[in-house]
UniProtKB/Swiss-Prot annotation:
This is Small hydrophobic protein. Interacts with host TNFRSF1A, RIPK1 and IRAK1; these interactions interfere with host NF-kappa-B activation at the level of receptor complexes. Interacts with host protein UBQLN4. The keyword Lipid biosynthesis does not apply. Signal peptide: none annotated. GO terms for cellular component: host cell plasma membrane; membrane; virion membrane. The keyword Isomerase does not apply.
Length: 57
């Protein structure tokens, strides 16, 4: 068995781990951003609706 084999295996494992961490991080960030954006949009829409109602009277 060549000496490079375990090193290659370790590198491959590290790359997979890195990929998983990055994917998880991106997923969490996008989920949080999406939820925050939706909440802000709902609040903005509500306040805009209220404002238009107040000004129409």
């Amino acid at each position: 068995m060549p000496a490079i084999q375990p090193l290659l295996y370790l590198t491959f494992l590290l790359l997979i781990l890195l990929y998983l961490i990055i994917t998880l991080y991106v997923w969490v960030v996008s989920t949080i951003t999406y939820k925050t954006a939706v909440r802000h949009a709902a609040l903005y829409q509500r306040s805009l609706f209220r404002w238009s109602l107040d000004h129409s009277l």
